[in-house]
Each structure stands twice: as C-alpha cells, then as structure tokens.
Curated annotation (Swiss-Prot):
Enzyme superclass (EC): oxidoreductase
Protein name: Peptide methionine sulfoxide reductase MsrA
Active site: C57
GO function term, MF aspect, one: peptide-methionine (S)-S-oxide reductase activity
Record's catalysed reaction(s): L-methionyl-[protein] + [thioredoxin]-disulfide + H2O = L-methionyl-(S)-S-oxide-[protein] + [thioredoxin]-dithiol; [thioredoxin]-disulfide + L-methionine + H2O = L-methionine (S)-S-oxide + [thioredoxin]-dithiol
Organism: Agrobacterium fabrum (strain C58 / ATCC 33970)
Length: 216
C-alpha cells in the first residue's frame, strides 16, 4: 500500500493548495554555460527567441539542444507547477506540479521553431503521460511552454501533425504533451546545469518512437 500511495502521489498533479510551498530565495546557478561560456540568464543578443521544452529527464534533453546548430544557450529548470523556487528533491516527490524542462534560447534565422519542434517530437515519446521510459512522475511529463502566441499556435499544429503521423504508423497512443504559455521558470541547481558535459557517462533516458515528424 505504501508503494502504491507513493507512486500515486508522484503521478497525480497536486493543486495549488496541496503543493509544497517552496521558498522566496532562488537557487544558486552559475553565471555562464559550462559548454559554451554564454550567460545562462542573459542578457541575450537581440533577435533571439526562447521556448521551454520538457522531454522527461532534462539531462539528456539539454545536451540534445545545446548541440543543435542555431541554439545559442540552454539551461535546465522547473516549470508548469506551483511551488516557488523548488529543489530537485521536492520536484521528484510529485508535490510541486513542475515538469523538468530545458530553456532553449535560439536564433530563428539559423533554426526555425519548426526545426526545434521536429527534434522535440522525434527524440522522446510524447504519449507516455506522467512518465518517460523508466522515469515515473509528473516531473517527467512531456511539455511545451511557449513565450509567444505564435509559438503556442505552432506547437499545437506540430502536435496535431505528429499525432497523424503516429496514427498512420500504427503507434496507437494519443499524444499527452502539455502545451501552454510559460508562467514561471525556475532554474535548477548548479549540479544539473549541463550535467552530461560535466558527467559524460551519466544517465540519458531519451528514447523516441521511431516515427518521423514532418512539419514545415
């Protein structure tokens, strides 16, 4: 019964009233990206855009995007929940409501949002609900948090296009990706920033469906 209750708490979204309260103080994070030396929090050059993408464990997802041409800088953190300035330990309880996400700062003149969304949908399984592979809990849900109305509309169209591709491929499951405007992003602890650059042999749970996302 204890294990069932624990799993249920991890896979059920809390309400604002039941979520952990958190704290006023933000977590300490480095000023610059471990790989490319660019500022994690800005300021960023004019013309860049930002989107927040959740693909399960953020370690592998962040590496995927910092290696993508046109992505200027990345950072990992928590979004989509209620707890203020949550810690990693708090998010893993499922009692903050947050998802692990990657902040992707990109140059749309080099890589389009469609290009990023293609990577997003192809490189994880967006049909798994409150889990990603062996990682179970609300924090590992698939999510897209937009910073503009245009991003929001494109994300919804990309989801619909990929759902059609999954159906045609006989995948048989509905996309569960949460899509909405970003409300608040909280940076994760220093330890998690660019984790797989600091720990090259570390865990990466990214697994796609094998279905192509053909969006223009």
């Amino acid at each position: 019964m204890f294990l069932f209750d624990t799993l249920s708490k991890k896979t059920t979204m809390p309400t604002e009233e039941t979520a952990l309260p958190g704290r006023e103080e933000a977590l300490a994070v480095p000023e610059t990206h471990f790989v490319n030396g660019r500022p994690l929090k800005g300021p960023y050059p004019d013309g860049l855009e930002i989107i927040y993408l959740g693909m399960g464990c953020f370690w592998g997802a962040e590496r995927l995007f910092w290696k993508t041409p046109g992505v200027w800088v990345t950072a990992v953190g928590y979004a989509g929940g209620f707890t203020r300035n949550p810690t990693y330990h708090e998010t893993t309880t499922g009692q903050t409501g947050h998802a692990e996400v990657v902040k992707v700062v990109y140059d749309p003149a080099v890589i389009s949002l469609s290009g990023l969304l293609k990577i997003f949908f192809e490189e994880h399984d967006p049909t798994q609900g409150m889990r990603q592979g062996n990682d179970v809990g609300t924090t590992y849900r698939s999510a897209i948090y937009a910073t503009t109305e245009g991003q929001l509309q494109q994300a919804q169209k990309a989801r619909d296009a990929f759902q059609q591709a999954l159906d045609e491929a006989g995948h048989g499951h509905a996309i569960t990706t949460e899509i909405g405007p970003l409300e608040t992003f909280y940076y994760a602890e220093d330890y998690h920033q660019q984790y797989l650059a600091k720990n090259p042999g570390g865990y990466c749970g990214l697994r796609g469906t094998g279905v192509s996302c053909n969006i223009g």
